[in-house]
Curated annotation (Swiss-Prot):
Source species of the chain: Vibrio parahaemolyticus serotype O3:K6 (strain RIMD 2210633)
Enzyme class of the recorded protein, top EC level: transferase
Short name of one Pfam family: IspD
Protein name from the UniProt record: 2-C-methyl-D-erythritol 4-phosphate cytidylyltransferase
Marked site positions, Transition state stabilizer: R20, K27
Length: 234
């Protein structure tokens, strides 16, 4: 583990509905081995020695969250989520700035329960020595095709410098807050935290992480996540 003993705060935007799962509830509340996806994710973050607290942004009136084991955990704080991911993250950042001042925050997808502590440790090590921060990422392995308007292949994209963006993504609290607030105010499309920093002209680090750190998006992803988690437990 990293020798850096400072504590950081993690923010988990969990206000999404996950319509592609075609389930009766948002994907973060689907079960894997008796626990919700969100519980697995938050517990994984809390297990890292350098993460002091986890701020979870959920929809106001969410009927599922109060029933979770993490809802009463002393190191888990609930804040109101927003319409878009960036709104939820900004809500978490505003809480952190007001109540839990810290230099760095890690933002992690609610639907990525398979992140490893070693990957988080490596991310923290790299980011704390980087002027901007960075993200976990995985190099693209497959041949990539760009489609034309008819959904036929237009050309093959050089994958040499292409990476899949994963999470957590770790940035300085004040800089990320400013980037997201300014981008939202100007109507800039922000798909992840790194894109907000890129919009400011920054160049975040790419920290190679495990491709097993999947985001649960489709129904078949649940079984794959369960496999990875069970293998991790041994």
């Amino acid at each position: 583990m990293s020798e850096n003993v400072s504590s950081h705060i993690a923010i988990v935007p969990a206000a999404g509905v996950g319509s592609r799962m075609k389930a009766d509830r948002p994907k973060q509340y689907l079960l894997i081995d008796g626990k919700t996806v969100l519980e697995h994710t938050v517990e994984k973050l809390l297990a890292h020695p350098q993460i002091a607290k986890v701020v979870v942004a959920v929809t106001e009136g969410d009927p599922y969250y109060p029933e979770l084991s993490i809802a009463l955990h002393p190191d888990v704080i609930r804040v109101a989520g927003g319409k878009e991911r960036a709104d939820s993250v900004l809500s978490g950042l505003n809480y952190v700035s007001a109540q839990l001042p810290c230099e760095w925050v890690l933002v992690h997808d609610a639907a990525r329960p398979c992140v490893t502590l070693n990957d988080i440790d490596r991310l923290i090590d790299v980011c704390c020595a980087h002027p901007t921060g960075g993200i976990l990422a995985s190099p693209v392995r497959d041949t990539m095709k760009r489609a034309n308007k008819e959904n036929n292949i237009d050309h093959t994209v050089d994958r040499e410098a292409l990476w899949h963006a994963l999470t957590p993504q770790m940035f300085k609290t004040q800089q990320l807050t400013r980037a997201l607030a300014d981008a939202l105010q100007q109507g800039v499309a922000i798909t992840d935290e790194a894109s907000a920093l890129e919009w400011l002209g920054e160049t975040p680090a790419l920290v190679q992480g495990s491709a097993n750190n999947i985001k649960i998006t489709q129904p078949e992803d649940l079984a794959l996540a369960e496999f990875y988690l069970s293998r991790e437990r041994g």
